[in-house]
Protein backbone atom coordinates (compact mmCIF):
# COMPACT_ATOMS: atom_id res chain seq x y z
CA UNK A 1 0.00 0.00 0.00
CA UNK A 2 2.84 2.43 0.80
CA UNK A 3 4.27 1.91 -2.68
CA UNK A 4 0.88 2.64 -4.22
CA UNK A 5 0.46 5.78 -2.10
CA UNK A 6 3.85 7.05 -3.24
CA UNK A 7 2.85 6.58 -6.86
CA UNK A 8 -0.53 8.24 -6.27
CA UNK A 9 1.22 11.25 -4.77
CA UNK A 10 3.49 11.48 -7.80
CA UNK A 11 0.46 11.24 -10.12
CA UNK A 12 -1.39 13.94 -8.16
CA UNK A 13 1.67 16.19 -8.15
CA UNK A 14 1.96 15.91 -11.94
CA UNK A 15 -1.76 16.54 -12.36
CA UNK A 16 -1.57 19.62 -10.14
CA UNK A 17 1.50 20.89 -12.01
CA UNK A 18 -0.28 20.46 -15.35
CA UNK A 19 -3.37 22.28 -14.07
CA UNK A 20 -1.57 25.32 -12.63
CA UNK A 21 0.61 25.58 -15.76
CA UNK A 22 -2.53 25.74 -17.92
CA UNK A 23 -3.89 28.43 -15.59
CA UNK A 24 -0.67 30.45 -15.94
CA UNK A 25 0.04 30.39 -12.20
CA UNK A 26 3.71 30.79 -11.29
CA UNK A 27 4.91 28.45 -8.59
CA UNK A 28 8.01 27.02 -7.00
CA UNK A 29 8.95 23.45 -7.88
CA UNK A 30 11.40 21.53 -5.72
CA UNK A 31 12.51 18.11 -6.91
CA UNK A 32 14.41 15.40 -5.10
CA UNK A 33 13.96 12.98 -2.23
CA UNK A 34 12.49 14.40 0.96
CA UNK A 35 15.41 13.13 3.06
CA UNK A 36 18.02 15.04 1.01
CA UNK A 37 19.32 18.00 3.05
CA UNK A 38 19.39 20.27 -0.01
CA UNK A 39 15.73 19.46 -0.75
CA UNK A 40 14.81 20.12 2.88
CA UNK A 41 16.62 23.49 2.79
CA UNK A 42 14.89 24.53 -0.44
CA UNK A 43 11.47 23.51 0.88
CA UNK A 44 12.22 25.28 4.18
CA UNK A 45 13.17 28.45 2.30
CA UNK A 46 9.97 28.26 0.27
CA UNK A 47 7.90 27.68 3.42
CA UNK A 48 9.41 30.73 5.16
CA UNK A 49 8.67 32.85 2.09
CA UNK A 50 5.10 31.52 1.92
CA UNK A 51 4.57 32.32 5.60
CA UNK A 52 5.91 35.83 5.01
CA UNK A 53 3.53 36.39 2.11
CA UNK A 54 0.54 35.07 4.05
CA UNK A 55 1.38 37.10 7.16
CA UNK A 56 2.06 40.19 5.05
CA UNK A 57 -1.35 40.01 3.42
CA UNK A 58 -3.14 41.26 6.54
CA UNK A 59 -0.68 43.71 8.08
CA UNK A 60 -2.08 46.79 9.77
CA UNK A 61 0.34 49.72 9.99
CA UNK A 62 -0.04 52.58 12.46
CA UNK A 63 1.47 55.88 11.38
CA UNK A 64 2.38 58.27 14.17
CA UNK A 65 1.27 61.58 12.66
CA UNK A 66 1.30 61.43 8.88
CA UNK A 67 3.74 62.72 6.32
CA UNK A 68 6.79 64.72 7.24
CA UNK A 69 6.36 68.25 5.97
CA UNK A 70 8.28 69.16 2.81
CA UNK A 71 9.85 65.72 2.47
CA UNK A 72 8.38 63.95 -0.55
CA UNK A 73 9.95 60.56 0.09
CA UNK A 74 7.93 60.13 3.28
CA UNK A 75 4.62 60.17 1.41
CA UNK A 76 4.33 56.56 0.40
CA UNK A 77 1.15 55.37 -1.26
CA UNK A 78 -1.23 54.05 1.36
CA UNK A 79 -3.86 53.13 -1.23
CA UNK A 80 -1.37 51.19 -3.36
CA UNK A 81 -0.09 49.40 -0.25
CA UNK A 82 -3.66 48.30 0.46
CA UNK A 83 -4.34 47.27 -3.14
CA UNK A 84 -1.05 45.52 -3.87
CA UNK A 85 -0.12 44.02 -0.50
CA UNK A 86 -3.38 44.10 1.47
CA UNK A 87 -1.82 46.39 4.09
CA UNK A 88 -4.02 48.77 6.02
CA UNK A 89 -2.15 52.00 6.81
CA UNK A 90 -3.81 54.38 9.26
CA UNK A 91 -2.45 57.68 10.57
CA UNK A 92 -3.12 58.91 14.09
CA UNK A 93 -2.37 62.35 15.48
CA UNK A 94 0.80 62.08 17.53
CA UNK A 95 -0.93 63.52 20.60
CA UNK A 96 -3.56 60.75 20.54
CA UNK A 97 -0.77 58.22 20.88
CA UNK A 98 1.08 60.47 23.35
CA UNK A 99 -1.99 60.33 25.60
CA UNK A 100 -1.52 56.55 25.76
CA UNK A 101 2.16 57.12 26.63
CA UNK A 102 1.23 59.61 29.36
CA UNK A 103 -1.16 57.06 30.89
CA UNK A 104 1.71 54.63 31.68
CA UNK A 105 2.19 54.32 35.44
CA UNK A 106 5.42 54.95 37.33
CA UNK A 107 5.67 51.32 38.57
CA UNK A 108 5.38 50.04 34.98
CA UNK A 109 8.05 52.48 33.82
CA UNK A 110 10.40 51.56 36.68
CA UNK A 111 9.97 47.84 36.02
CA UNK A 112 10.90 48.27 32.37
CA UNK A 113 13.87 50.52 33.20
CA UNK A 114 15.10 47.79 35.56
CA UNK A 115 14.74 45.29 32.71
CA UNK A 116 16.79 47.57 30.44
CA UNK A 117 19.56 47.86 33.03
CA UNK A 118 19.56 44.08 33.57
CA UNK A 119 19.55 43.23 29.88
CA UNK A 120 21.83 45.87 28.38
CA UNK A 121 25.27 47.18 29.19
CA UNK A 122 24.63 50.86 29.88
CA UNK A 123 27.66 53.04 29.16
CA UNK A 124 27.71 56.12 31.36
CA UNK A 125 31.13 57.56 30.53
CA UNK A 126 30.94 61.30 31.10
CA UNK A 127 27.23 61.21 31.91
CA UNK A 128 25.37 61.80 35.12
CA UNK A 129 23.88 58.38 35.99
CA UNK A 130 20.70 59.78 37.54
CA UNK A 131 20.00 62.19 34.70
CA UNK A 132 20.68 59.50 32.10
CA UNK A 133 18.29 57.10 33.85
CA UNK A 134 15.54 59.74 33.55
CA UNK A 135 16.03 59.78 29.78
CA UNK A 136 15.95 55.98 29.68
CA UNK A 137 12.69 56.09 31.67
CA UNK A 138 11.15 58.25 28.94
CA UNK A 139 11.98 55.55 26.38
CA UNK A 140 10.45 52.91 28.65
CA UNK A 141 7.29 54.98 28.96
CA UNK A 142 7.11 55.42 25.17
CA UNK A 143 7.69 51.70 24.57
CA UNK A 144 4.90 50.69 26.94
CA UNK A 145 2.49 53.34 25.63
CA UNK A 146 3.15 52.57 21.97
CA UNK A 147 2.86 48.82 22.53
CA UNK A 148 -0.45 49.22 24.37
CA UNK A 149 -1.77 51.39 21.54
CA UNK A 150 -0.60 48.88 18.91
CA UNK A 151 -2.22 45.98 20.77
CA UNK A 152 -5.44 47.84 21.51
CA UNK A 153 -5.88 48.78 17.85
CA UNK A 154 -4.51 45.45 16.53
CA UNK A 155 -1.57 46.87 14.55
CA UNK A 156 1.45 44.86 13.41
CA UNK A 157 3.78 47.70 12.43
CA UNK A 158 4.48 51.33 13.24
CA UNK A 159 5.79 54.28 11.24
CA UNK A 160 7.20 57.37 12.94
CA UNK A 161 9.11 60.47 11.91
CA UNK A 162 10.93 63.26 13.70
CA UNK A 163 8.93 66.10 12.13
CA UNK A 164 6.13 65.98 14.69
CA UNK A 165 6.79 64.90 18.26
CA UNK A 166 3.67 66.53 19.66
CA UNK A 167 3.64 65.93 23.42
CA UNK A 168 6.29 63.19 23.25
CA UNK A 169 9.39 64.17 25.23
CA UNK A 170 11.85 62.30 22.97
CA UNK A 171 12.13 60.56 19.65
CA UNK A 172 11.15 56.93 20.19
CA UNK A 173 14.60 55.38 19.59
CA UNK A 174 15.12 52.59 22.10
CA UNK A 175 11.36 52.13 22.32
CA UNK A 176 11.13 51.36 18.59
CA UNK A 177 14.13 49.01 18.68
CA UNK A 178 12.48 47.06 21.48
CA UNK A 179 9.16 46.92 19.60
CA UNK A 180 11.03 45.51 16.58
CA UNK A 181 12.64 42.95 18.88
CA UNK A 182 9.12 41.91 19.89
CA UNK A 183 8.16 41.37 16.25
CA UNK A 184 6.55 44.68 15.27
CA UNK A 185 7.48 46.08 11.88
CA UNK A 186 8.93 49.58 11.66
CA UNK A 187 9.42 52.24 9.03
CA UNK A 188 10.41 55.88 9.18
Residue ranges and their predicted role:
Residues 1-188:
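An N-terminal assembly and electron-transfer interface module characteristic of large anaerobic redox
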Amino acid sequence: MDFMNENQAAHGDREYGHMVTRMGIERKVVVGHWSDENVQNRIGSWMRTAIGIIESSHIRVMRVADNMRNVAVTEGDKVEAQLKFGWEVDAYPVNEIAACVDAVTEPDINALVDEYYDKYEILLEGRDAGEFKKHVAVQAQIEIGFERFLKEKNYHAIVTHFGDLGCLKQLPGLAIQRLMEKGYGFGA
